Amino acid sequence: MPPKIRTLAKTILKDPEEVKIAISRPPESIMQTAYICYDPQKLKILQDLFTQSRPQRVIIFSSSKMKVKELASTLKRLKFNVAAMHSDLEQSQREEVMKEFKSGHIDILVATDVVARGIDINDIKLVVNFDIPHDPEDYVHRIGRTARGTNGEGLAITFVSIDEQAQFKRIEDFLEKEVYKIPVSPEFGEVPLYEPEKYGMNKRGRGRPRKSEDKRSSSSPQKRNMGHRGRPKKV
């Protein structure tokens, strides 16, 4: 509770009781990674990842049903086995999509946060945050879906554009840890620096680019889990 709210409550309430709820944290067994990039680069990097290693049991989260529809449609055109889950679907349609996803007939599920809350599937190999959630706890709920398998391990990849850097920094502060930033391959062009204090949610601009082969957070122990060209070894 913010200090000002606590002070106000004490002035207007008589002997108030304060209940503290434990803050949820993702399992340590989840390897959390991020790409710092420009918004148009997100799809290109995602396509490259899926081309290098066939995606299986992947959930991609996007911020709105319109974006979910667009992303699913684009991935279908790229010949990926994908389905969309959003609020415009009838209940029977949602159930059919989930049935196909659980059975393995669909490799990739693109979904919004609200609709995806009812998804309870084990052995999700990868969670992709194509857009960053506004609430850090939504981030925890998202990536937690990839740690429900038999070994409790999982992989989460988050794409962070300039306008999302401040949001992502809040997530890192909430987690009390720095998420490993995967170096972007030079083939995708220059990428922005990770400067969340400069490029907040309401600050727009191209940002100061850097060459994508420059390494960031190179001291992270998670580097040993990365393949060549900075890609995760497994998808």
What are these regions (language model features)?
Residues 1-193:
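Conserved helicase RecA-like core
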